[in-house]
């Protein structure tokens, strides 16, 4: 089976590929070799815009040899429409069915959603099977394209050993007098993420409260791109400004690599509250990381985030605060509510355990491949 993108850690966990010996990438441009996904082919933001995207799918030098099935998650957004058509035509000509998991109905990083919508529509209509993560997303896909997806809830991203290690290490990142540690996830600082304005809006959380700490979590390459050669000085300036004006006991910048979340897990586990400041979204893998590590998320009322987090449970009994992004004061109110009334994260729904998720995918693969 070929998987796009095969190297993405979330994808591998979602479909249970970590133990697989033969995982192939679906390269949507020439020159990608068998086995592992090169880093530059994982996300559209990391792709060379001058590269030729032919739509051909190669395994080593021989197209589609020994490939029975393709599973596409994401990573196709950078393609021109004719290249997406070429991918579909190439698969049809070779007689290789493909499964599509729709993580994002709206473009996850840019306001112009038309290219992503067109790409997704082309793939949805051609796929042998379509999967998504929530019932409300499945309904939206049916309304838009008349397809009836299989809903496979998001499984956990971390196993018990990883969770225990992160929690233990996270305790060493907090002092005995740190009653509140708030994280703000800026990800790649794309158009879908609120920036400095939101950091300013969080100032009331720390005012009049001793021992409130702020952690700004950002993807390392995005930070390097934003700050250029002055990235260290820029980071120190931002931290100093927020610490002085926001009243935080401390402010620290936490950078992570997109393909290696291991080092950032203790930082995440050390948080009491994590703000996910999306301007628009469909689902969020980071919500599932909060669930794994027992961190209370604060997120806006956009996309299907609320449905994903509170899937089939009572919001009043569990952690997680939803705020109105149109109200400048709402995010601080939500963070205060989350910190002053700590509750357990919602449990995962039936069918989200790793064994069931893997079994469900295996059944879908067999049906799509005609086996």
Language-model regions: role of each:
Residues 171-199, 203, 215-216:
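Conserved donor-binding/catalytic core segment of Leloir-type glycosyltransferases
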Residues 31-32, 152-168, 188, 221-223, ...:
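Short beta-strand->alpha-helix junction loop in the catalytic core
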Residues 250, 265-282, 292-295:
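Acidic donor-binding loop of glycosyltransferase active sites
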Residues 125-168:
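Donor nucleotide-sugar binding/catalytic pocket of nucleotide-sugar-dependent glycosyltransferases
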Residues 322, 326-329, 333-371:
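A charged, aromatic-enriched C-terminal amphipathic alpha-helix characteristic of glycosyltransferases
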Residues 290, 296-306:
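Short hydrophobic beta-strand element within catalytic cores of glycosyltransferases
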């Amino acid at each position: 089976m070929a998987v796009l993108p095969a190297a993405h850690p979330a994808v591998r966990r979602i479909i249970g590929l970590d133990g697989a010996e033969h995982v192939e990438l679906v390269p949507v441009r020439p020159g990608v070799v068998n086995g592992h996904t090169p880093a530059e082919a994982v996300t559209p933001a990391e792709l060379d815009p001058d590269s030729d995207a032919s739509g051909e799918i190669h395994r080593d030098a021989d197209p589609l040899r020994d490939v029975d099935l393709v599973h596409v998650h994401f990573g196709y957004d950078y393609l021109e429409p004719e290249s997406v058509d070429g991918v579909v035509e190439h698969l049809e000509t070779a007689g290789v069915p493909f499964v599509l998991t729709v993580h994002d109905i709206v473009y996850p990083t840019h306001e112009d959603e038309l290219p992503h919508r067109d790409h997704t529509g082309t793939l949805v209509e051609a796929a042998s099977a379509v999967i998504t993560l929530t019932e409300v997303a499945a309904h939206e896909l049916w309304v838009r394209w008349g397809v009836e997806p299989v809903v496979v809830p998001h499984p956990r991203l971390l196993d018990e050993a990883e969770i225990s290690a992160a929690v233990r290490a996270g305790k060493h990142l907090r002092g005995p007098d740190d009653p509140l540690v708030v994280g703000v996830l800026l990800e790649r600082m794309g158009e879908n993420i609120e920036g400095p304005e939101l950091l300013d809006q969080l100032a009331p959380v720390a005012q009049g409260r001793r021992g409130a700490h702020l952690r700004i979590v950002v993807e390392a390459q995005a930070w390097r791109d934003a700050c250029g050669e002055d990235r260290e000085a820029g980071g120190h300036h931002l931290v100093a400004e927020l610490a002085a004006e926001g009243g935080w006991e401390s402010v620290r910048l936490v950078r992570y690599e997109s393909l290696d979340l291991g080092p950032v897990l203790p930082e995440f586990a050390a948080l009491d509250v994590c703000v996910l400041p999306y301007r628009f979204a469909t689902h969020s893998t980071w919500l599932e990381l909060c669930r794994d590590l027992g961190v209370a998320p604060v997120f806006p009322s956009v996309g299907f985030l609320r449905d994903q987090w509170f899937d089939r449970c009572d919001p009043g009994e569990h952690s997680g605060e939803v705020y109105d992004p149109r109200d400048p004061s709402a995010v601080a109110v939500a963070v205060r509510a989350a910190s002053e009334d700590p509750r357990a994260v919602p449990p995962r729904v039936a069918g989200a355990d790793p064994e069931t998720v893997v079994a469900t995918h295996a059944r879908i693969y067999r049906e799509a491949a005609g086996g």
